[in-house]
Structure formats: structure tokens, C-alpha cells
């Protein structure tokens, strides 16, 4: 049945844009029609990942499945629920160093204008589940006999909440005997407390008697003055801040005392905190406070874990009024909510969308360096509402007609040049002169829309389009973009069935690309072609068409394209590894506060142009000033963190990446009598990013993103009963140097991977690499077994490096890592012979040196197989053997191979299945098929295992399709003709990008020709 797909459908249209740095990893997985998950690991605060929700110019699918460009979101609304783990939360008020709080949009308009839509804005963001709490902390106020003018100051950022005991809380009266019968009196709130003097009384006894009398007063306490025995200290007893009048017969002076205790102080401080105009002052994380007795509870007004970064500290004048702790850090906040987000695209000002995406960033480490953090973003109830016709994405149906740039139906005038690239069939034609023209004849049996396949970019020319001589229209191919986009644009609608002529003429300066013309009969996704049980494209996890897609979308592609044969995945050389950073320098500055600061001084720290300060109050030490800035920085900044020890403050950039480089300055503004000073050492703009090196110590060997993706991928395979073999090779990007193979001059084997500036290293068969590969293969086997698969693993191109650096002085073949040389010396009784090139004679020294090397390869593979099968006895292993670089004599356009390569890279035990340790042998000869285009050589590769005695049922073949116009269909037919049961195409991305034919090819007389 045809299948309808929709915009923003998680298992059909979403994909990763990618993630930043080799230390990071991300995966889109567990996708259904209304849910999905993105997960991974971040190891640096500068790491981020991007999920593309919509791209009107679909890069991924084969033309049979690739949806037509559609930017219309007018009248559509997206609603979803989401929960984050280990990420910056959507509701965090922190400054966004990357766009994690937003939906980013590029509009489909003339200027490709952009929009940033806050996801947590009121009205579109509500909590529907989970837990979301605020951080709190408590101060206990201590009254150790506080006196008038005692002081307690709480500091948060540079806000002080200052409590001064302004009213008297006690008074003193002295009593002197005046003769028997004299009535001595103290009056409290109108109540007299008396003692009638006797003949036996002394001044002291009179005072003690009055103290005893006052013991019944609820409003005051009375104690004997330790300095004068006849004096009474009277203190307000209630902690209610209420006045009480006290007078005495011994003095004409009356006092009004106030009931000030720890509770009064706590309540007053709470009032001060709550009275601050937090909003007007623009405070990022405002506070609120309550008091119960002597306990002052301070809470973040905002919920979420950012509150756990806040510290409030206390500065008492003396020990009479203080707190049990000198500072409190708020804690207990939880950010584990499920948020519902609603996005009405038209109301948000984005009715036409070319691209939109979410960004993920690591949660901010609290007052510390970020450690490796695994993370998840879990989406559910992901639903688009609005008119059905606008929700649906259409494809060019089976009645559509595509005319390629090199078809006979195209006539060119002017200067045009072919350009190789990710175009339909692998080529497009380019012109850069006004007036260059292509005329295309085509016929379509159905009413259709007309699309032009082209390339849009910032330097592209416009073209005038005419259909059957109608009025010319302009196709604008300019796009403000960092990279060119190969896509299609609609140039006519509702074209009637029949034959037509289209002229396309370059109209403005710049480059114009003609890829194809397509008469599109728009439909839902068509039924798949007949399933091909012997064939499937191979996957390379390193490529966009694998790691950026969810397994659900990937397997849907295979299903709808009719690829039902056993699958082959190469895990690649970089995205899956656990890594550690080496050679990095994280910038830091040390600030020392010295001398003696006095009230009225002000101290400032300026980081990246953002200044924070400290107003100096009484009793504030240099250590306290340092702590103040540490608390302030850790509560506020996202680019740095700080720690204080004594009077020294250390501020460190959170990352050595350029985005985290900041200017820095610290200074003091002092008043008369101050000797305070500030000195700084270091800088915050001297970071060295270092290298993200493979870390063999981490377990499991696959990072979180690769684990989650493969677990889901293997689940999808298991649901289809689809065999899958996963391969590793001897190449890694940034491995530990003890892994790397060496030429005789000690130079490492380094080769380009074709992705940016990354290079991979070919590794040796040394113990460190072997132990690492044991862990890797076991991790993969565990994931397969976890979902119910029998593990099937491939040793992909397990070879000694097949090229020489003989052009270098002391160069040769890459057999000379330290371990191999040491073991050769022990085994041969002499140094290993220096082999110079692949064509060297392996029989030198009676073949002892070459046999030693060959057996090292054999034993390396056997050790890995034994290690995995100790845990998974039923695990199956496949060898992928590249015959082009191991041909016994140089062959093909690049003259690959040689006797030495052939001898050492295919151990004698592997030439037949019994005793090889392998269940299947897969042959490849990428050069012979894709570059040399020599079917005779390809046939030799196909036949090699058969000629050696391997049973056909255990042989597989890998056909290269990565070069346009190679004779891949004929190579496939050769393999079928030899009885090879299962064939893979290298690789899936090229099948889609070039739009390769899906039908089973027919045998033709050209099958033996080098097409």
C-alpha cells in the first residue's frame, strides 16, 4: 500500500545535523510516529548537538522516497511533551552560549531570514508531569545576648540584607539601701515589682530580691551585673519586637526596651529579602524567604537545578548576633519535569519554514569542571495539527518523468562543464555566463508539476524558465547558506499531459547548475518494488546517511526500496568511540586580595566585559571577599567557574575552546585609610583545545550515543528477522600512539578520512590495540545479544597497511611498531627484514619474516574471536578481504597490490573455511569496480574464495557504487552468476544520493565489458 508521510513525523523526517567535537556523541533513536529520543554524551561545556525537525530540501532519501520541497506551515501547530536528563533545561534563565532554549528557524523567504523562538515562553510551555522543585537553604540565627547596634548582614551576589539592632534591648539600674522600710521598685509595663528593705539588707541583697521579684514578669528578664553586685540588668524577654517601658525607684530615667531576638532578626531579614525589586533589578535568579522562629529559610523564586548554584553568606559584627553557619548553599532543586510545548507556527511569525531545529547543550557543572555527562531528551505525544493537506509530504510518484543532465533530450548552447558531486546520477552541468542555455524535451502521460534539479547557494545565478514558449519566469537560485544545497525547485504547476519543451537560460552573473528536469506526479510514498532478498546497501556509521538518521527511518528506507538482504554495517573510524582529552590547556586566572580593606571600598572583577562587584562592609576579610566573588561567579556566569582559598580567587574558563575565551580585569576602588590591593596572574583567553583521543579504559567501548543507536538498530533488524553483521577495521581517528602502525623510519601510518581535516591512523596488531578491539567487539556482541540477535561480527580489512612510504629516507612498509620489532627479534633471532614496497619478495630469508608477519595477523584475529565467543559461544565471524590492494601483482589504474601484500594479508589458514575461524568470507575490490572499472579484475576478486575452496554458501561480495557511472550492475550480475548468495552495495548513501536504479538488472552482452 502507498504510505502517507507527514511533516515533523519522527520516524520519517527527523534527523541529526550532528554534534560538535569528537569528544561528544549524539544519536536519534527509538522513533515512532509520535515519539523519539535523542541521547549521547558531552565531555566539554562547548559541546552541543542539533536535531533537525524540518528541512524542505531533503538530503537523505532515494528519489523514490524523497519528499518534495515543502515549506508551508501556515495553519499548523506542533505540540509535544519532553523531558531532559543531563542537559541545560528549557526553562533555565542562564545565558544561552548556544541555542538550547530555542526553536531555531530559517524562513523560506527571499533573504532566508531567521527566527529564535523561546520554547519556555509563557503560554506555550507548561508542566504536565514529573518533578520540578526549587532550591532552598536555612540559616539559624543565634542570639548570644545581642545588644543595640549589633549587626548581621546577609549577602547574595552584591545585594546586602542588613539587619542593625537599632533599639535598646536592655537597661541597668543600681540600688543603694536607704533604711529599713524603704520600698525599692522596678516597674515593667505599669506593673510594679518591689522589695521592702529590712535591717539586714545590703545593696546586693536588695538587687537580688528585685531580681527574684522580676522572675514572675513575662516581659523581661533580670540578671545581676557581674561588674557591680548591686546593679540589675533588665532585658526584654519577648522576641516580638514590641516595646516595653521600664522604670525604677532608683533612677529618674525610664527606658523603652524592645523584644528583639533571633526570631525578630530572622523575620526582618526575610522581609528585606522579599522587599527587593528583583524584577526591576533584572536579577537572574531572585530569592524569596520565610522565617519560623530563629530559622530563616531562603528559596530560589525559580524552580530547577540552577537554584542549587546559589550561595548566601553572613557577616556578623560580633559573636552576640550571628548564624550557626557562615554561609549556606541552596540545594534540593530538581529539574525532572515533563514539559508540554505548543508551537503555532503562523502565530510565531514563521508560516514558511526552510529549516528548523532544536539544540542540546550539557548541563552546567555546579562550581566545578564538567565531567563526562551522558544525556537524554525524551519526546512523546509529538503531534502536528492543522489541515491534512498541509501536514502531508508528497513525493514524485511512479508516473513522474526525470530527464538527467546528460540525456539525449537535452540540448546545450554556451559553455557548460560537468561537475562531479552529490547530484542525481552523480553529475550536474554548470554554466557561469549569462545567456548559456539548455533546452529539454520531455513527455509525461499525466498532468504534472515541473521541477528543476539544481544547486542553490550564495554565488548562484538566476535562470529564466520558459515552458512551450510561455512567458519567462525567474528561478532564483541564491541562498544565504554556509554550504551549497543540491535540491529541486518547482517552476510550473498543473502542466497538462503530453510532450513539452523547456528552455533554461542563465540570467544573472554567477554559477548555474542543471542537474535534471522532473515532471512530478505528486503522490504518497509508493509501494516498494519486489523485495530483493540477496541484496542490501552496506552502511557506514561514519556517514550522514547512517548515524544522523534514526534506525526506524533508516530501516523504513530499506523496506520501501525493496532491500531485504542481509545487512552489513561498518562502524567507521570516529563517531562511536569513547574518548578523553589530551594536550589541552584550560585558561585560568588567579586573583589575590591583599592589604586591609575598609568600609567604603569597592572591588570589581570584569570577565568578558561583564563586571561584578563587592561593596566592602565592616568585618569583611580578604578571604570573605574572595569567597564573595566565587559565589557570585558560580551563581551567574556560564563561561567560567571559580573557587576561593583564603584571600585567593581562582577563575577558570569552563572550556579551552575559542568560544570560551574572555578578557579579564580585576581592580579595587579604595577610600582613605585603605591598603587593599588586587593582583592577578594568568588569563582567560589562552585555551588550547587539545585532542580527543580514543580512551581504551572506558567501558563499554562504545559511547552512549553509539550504544543507544545500535541497540535500537539491532532491535529493528530483529523485528524483521534481518541478518546484520557489524564491522570494525584497523583504522581509528586519534588512537593512543601505542596503537599505531609504523614505517621503518618510525613514521606513523596516517591517512585522510575524507571528513573535514580529520585523519585516521592505521593500527598495528600489537597487544594494546588487540585488547581494545576485544572490548569493542564484545560490546557490539552484547548489544546484539541483548535484543535477541545471534552476534555476527566482521573483521573489516584486517590487514597490514598495504602502502609504502619508500619515498622517505628510511621508508618502507608499515610493519615496524615497537612490539612487532621486539617479538620478531625474539622469534627470528635477528631484526625483522626491512621490506620496502608491496612487491617485495615474501620468500626472502626463506619466507621466515613474511610468515612471522602473516601469523601475527592470524593470531590477532583469533584472539578477538576467542574473546567474544567465550561470552557468546554462538557468535559468528566474517572476514572482509580487499583483493584490490592484495592482488599478487600490481593491478588497476593505481597499480595496487603486490606479492608481499598478498602473502602476509591472507594467512594460509584463512584460504579455506575449515580452520579459518570465520563463518563467512566477504570479498571486496573497490578500486577494480569503482575506479578502474575493470570487470575482469572484479571477477577475479569474486572468484578468489571459490578458487581457494570456500563453499559458495559462505562467500559474500561487496559491490562499490560510490563512483558515478561505474558498471556496478554488471559487477553485481557477475557475483550472482558465480552463485554468490548475498551481495552488499558500498554504500547506502551513494545509492540514495545518486538515485541508483532499484530494479534487478538483466544479464546483457555487455556484462563482461569494462563499462
What are the residue ranges of the model-derived segments?
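Short beta-strands within extracellular/lumenal beta-sheet-rich domains
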Residues: 35-72, 337-340, 424-445, 460-462, ...
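Extracellular carbohydrate recognition and processing domains
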Residues: 111-129, 336-347, 471-498, 507-509, ...
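Extended, beta-strand-rich, solvent-exposed assembly scaffolds of outer structural proteins
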Residues: 124-131, 138-336, 450, 586-670, ...
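Aromatic-lined carbohydrate-binding surfaces of glycoside hydrolases
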Residues: 564, 568-584, 689-856, 882-893, ...
